[in-house]
A protein has these predicted regions:
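Acidic/aromatic-lined carbohydrate-recognition and catalytic surfaces
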Residues: 1-168, 172, 176, 189-242
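Core domains of carbohydrate- and sulfate-ester-processing enzymes
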Residues: 103-145, 263-281, 348-373
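Loop/helix patches that line or flank the sugar-binding groove of alpha-linked glycan CAZymes
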Residues: 219-223, 246, 273-275, 279-285, ...
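Extended substrate-binding grooves/exosites of carbohydrate-active enzymes
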Residues: 201-230, 235-236, 240-270, 339-359
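Hydrophobic residues within beta-strands of alpha/beta enzymes
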Residues: 40, 182-184, 326
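Active-site regions of oxyanion-processing enzymes, predominantly non-cytosolic
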Residues: 174-175, 180-184
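Short, solvent-exposed loop/turn segments at secondary-structure junctions
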Residues: 9-11, 47-48, 92-93, 180, ...
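A structural motif
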Residues: 37, 179, 187, 322-323
């Protein structure tokens, strides 16, 4: 199984308004097949006032820029007809400050006032979140509310059973529309507060209990249809913490994998890779999801600038266990730098054509990193026999021939400075992989390796 993250606005435009949409995605199934995609993750497609969509106004409707609910259903049907599953990004921790629930809460209306978290007189309103020292309490019209992701995204109160039930209703609605599952955004933030003291504090026990409940509901809905649910969680934390959430949800993005390989390629030496494999890719009760990057990170090609090194990254990605995910355009070498206050540079329009002009090409924003005729387009990559895209297509074919890798694990890891070797097995099948990340030849365990080579025995 291979996953593919799509930022809807940037991928494929079906009506020439410059904005990617559901029908554009449906029209792209031939491309998905070429790169071996089995499951697509859509970033938020709901009604939202922002370009990124993570602050939601209505969980039960689509962003009209992307199409109607009927267009969404048509896209789902087309993907399913071509053997491709769909998971949707679901931010359940917070809503937009323009959401009807929050507007009613600000007016003091019941039951909506109890959907949110309000400051008490003894709270320290200068309390900040851990990772960047931003305030978590926000004052408006004489009321102070909790919003760990900013004042425009007030947190929901999951100590209120009504809020929990609303979240389960949202899951059921989209599962009944045909989605195969979810990417659960900010999973450790459902309970990230001490309600008695007004402090920012993760409660992993309560979070995991909630996700067990959510997955029980999702499986129940799918069971009535004779189908399975696929869900993946975002928990950016130590592997030991990730394990707890992943066990509940079934699959989790492996941030350490992405960080370790990027750092190793930048600075030389495989020690981070070895540590990552030992801590995250052993035998688990869940599937890890190793990935090239996402919308919250610098683009792969902006960190690993040599195409040969990016080919090594994809070799590592495709020979390790679980469900590998490709961030749209990473298979082409798209570039982009992430800024926490301005993430548009990592979500530029997907370049179908060398000229950035043609049927299906999105153009909702001016490009900064991926300009015309710079080599990172489908058209240009397909014209080269040695391109990164062609390499990814080859790895996709390998993955299709070895579907057992989804449920495998890594063992017997050995290494020198620039080479790592590892065995991948599911107990019945197995491969031995040798990877040289250096720009010079290496010989390890009697195996001769060319520069930047991934060899399977």
């Amino acid at each position: 199984m291979i996953g593919y993250e799509i930022f809807v606005r940037s991928f494929a435009d079906s009506n020439e308004d410059g904005i990617g949409d559901f029908i554009g995605i449906a029209n792209s199934v031939d491309y998905f097949k070429k790169i071996g995609v089995d499951v697509i993750w859509l970033t938020p497609h709901f009604k939202s006032p922002s370009y990124h969509g993570y602050d939601i106004i209505d969980y039960f409707d689509t962003n009209p820029s992307f199409g109607t609910v009927n267009d969404f259903k048509s896209m789902v049907d087309t993907l399913h007809a071509n053997g491709i599953k769909l998971v949707i990004d679901l931010p359940l921790n917070h809503v937009s400050d323009r959401h009807p629930w929050f507007k009613a809460a600000m007016r003091g209306e019941k039951p909506y006032e109890d959907y949110f978290l309000w400051a008490q007189p003894h709270f320290n309103l200068k309390e900040k979140r851990h990772w960047d020292e931003e305030f978590i309490w926000h004052e408006r019209n004489g009321k102070t509310y909790y919003g760990v992701f900013g004042g425009s995204s007030p947190d929901l109160n999951y100590d209120n059973p009504q809020v929990v039930q609303k979240s389960l209703d949202i899951l059921e609605f989209w599962l009944n529309l045909g989605v195969d599952g979810f990417r659960f955004d900010a999973a450790k933030h459902i309970y990230d507060y001490d309600i008695k003291e007004g402090r920012f504090r993760y409660d992993h026990d309560k979070n995991v209990n909630y996700w067990n409940l959510a997955m029980e509901k999702a499986r129940e809905v799918k069971r009535t249809k004779g189908e399975d649910v696929f869900a993946v969680t975002e928990v950016w934390d130590d592997p030991e913490i990730v394990d707890r959430y992943a066990t509940a949800i079934g699959c989790s993005f492996n941030f350490y994998f992405t960080e370790a390989i990027r750092e190793s390629m930048q600075h030389g030496g495989v020690y981070k890779i070895v540590d990552c494999f030992q801590r995250t890719l052993g035998k688990k009760s869940y599937k890890p999801s190793n990935f090239t990057g996402n919308h919250d990170m610098n683009r792969l090609a902006s960190i690993i600038t040599k195409e040969d090194e990016r080919k090594v990254f994809f070799g590592l990605l495709m020979t390790t266990p679980g469900v590998p995910f490709i961030y749209y355009g990473d298979e082409l070498g798209m570039r982009g730098a992430y800024d926490s206050t301005f993430s548009e540079d990592v979500i530029e329009p997907f370049p179908w054509y060398a000229s950035l002009s043609g049927d299906g090409q999105a153009f909702w924003k001016a490009v900064r990193f991926n300009r015309a005729f710079t080599g990172a387009s489908v058209e240009e990559q397909m014209s080269r026999s040695d391109s990164l895209l062609k390499e990814v297509m080859n790895w996709a074919a390998f993955r299709k021939e070895n579907e057992w890798l989804t449920n495998a694990w890594v063992e017997n890891i050995t290494h020198n400075t620039f080479t790592v070797a590892y065995t991948v097995t599911d107990g019945k099948n197995g491969i031995r992989v040798y990877v040289n990340i250096a720009g010079h030849g290496e010989t390890f365990e009697g195996i001769a390796l060319k520069p930047y080579q991934v060899k399977i025995l």
